[in-house]
Every structure is written in structure tokens, then in C-alpha cells.
UniProtKB/Swiss-Prot annotation:
Any matching Pfam family: Formyl_trans_N
PROSITE patterns the record matches: GART
Protein name: Methionyl-tRNA formyltransferase
GO molecular function, one term: methionyl-tRNA formyltransferase activity
Name of the gene this protein is made from: fmt
Species assigned in the record: Vibrio alginolyticus
Amino acid sequence: SFKSDEAKQELADLNADLMVFVAYGMLLPQAVLDTPKLGCINVHGSILPRWRCAAPIQRSIWAGDAETGVTIMQMDIGLDTGDMLKIATLPIETTDTSASMYEKLAELGPEALIDCLADIAAGKAVPVKQDDELANYAKKLSKEEARINWNDDAAHIERCVRAFNPWPMSHFEAAENSIKVWKAVWQSKPVTTSGTIVQADKTGIYVVTGNGVLVLEQLQVPGKKAMSVQDILNSRAAWFEVGTLLV
């Protein structure tokens, strides 16, 4: 964290032109930011200023954003508030999870960084200030937040399933057991009481939400690996009978 005088001196002794940070997640003292001749830059996993802070990938899926990307920014004393040097984007597919987006951004980030470093070396990098009015705080995820509220819109729940995969995993209770949802789709249909199972077969477990129906396709019961709904119903059909109210 470069807080000690010894660490700061070691950094100064490097006589570095530039420092690059990736997924660092901590604020740097101004003295450290000023040590390299060209300052410090960071590879941030979103299109700034849309999502700042801890969980930009998950929040972009959760919010239903059409695209995400990486931003190479000049670091300042704030958290993800520095001037933008380069932005690279890619679409968020309707099947993308946080896990799949991490993999895509892990490829995009180094490419954008190399391009940005070339621009800096050539004196072509143009810093662009962020519009704070467009910024959102991508707070850390929690297990409590991942619990499904069946009164929510089905499309929103489906996005949460993808955003919270692989952690903390969207979940609900059935027969007093916590069930993790690995995959689901949503449908727009006339509905009854939220949380009610209206169909359960090899095609999925159909659950009424506040708006539409969520079709559960892959679940995980306590002590087991994630399984298809067909396999779940073969052994635990009583947990998911039509008319059952999930909580």
C-alpha cells in the first residue's frame, strides 16, 4: 500500500516513468501518485464513469447495460475518478454471467493497455475528464442481496442470476433448503401469486414473479454440485410441486 517511508523510498529508487495497476482496489497516497514521471494508470473493468468502485462487472449485468468494457485511466486521489486515457468496449450478451465477462475483459484489458501505453509513449494520449453526474457506485455484492425476491420483475431476477454467478449466487428456499440458481430464463405471461411454481418438468421450473415468469434451468441443492432441473426433479420432485410457494 506504499504507506511506509521505506516502501516509498524503494519506489522512488526505481526511477520509474510510469506505474500500471490492475484490479488494485485501494487508494494511493498523493506522494506515490506523484513519484513516477508520468504518474500512475489503472485498468478499470467498466466504461467510466458509469460504474466506479468494487463490482463494476456485476453491476453492469445487474442493471441490464447493453455494453461494458475497460477504461485506462490516470489515477488520482479519488476512487476511479481520474482522467480517462482510453476506453475499449464490448457488448453484454443475454447469456453472459459475471464469470464469462471476466474472461472477456481479461483479454480486452491487456490489448487496451498496450494501445494506451503506445499512445503515451508517442505523446498522443489525450486525458478526458469524467462527468461525475454520470457516475454510479458499484458497491460490493452480498449474500443477502443475492436472495431472490419473487415480487421483483422476472427479467430483473434473471439478470441477477447472471450477475451473481459465480458469487454470491442467487438463491431461494425450497423445503427449508437453500437452493442456488445457476441458470434461468424469463418469460412474459399472465401470473398469479409471486413465488408460486406453475409448471415443473424437464424444460424447467416455472416460477411466478412480480412481472412475468422465471424459468429455472440449473440449480444447486445443499451438499451437491449444480445440476439440471431434470436431474433435480428426478430426486426431489416433492420440493418443486406445482402450487408450491417459494420463499
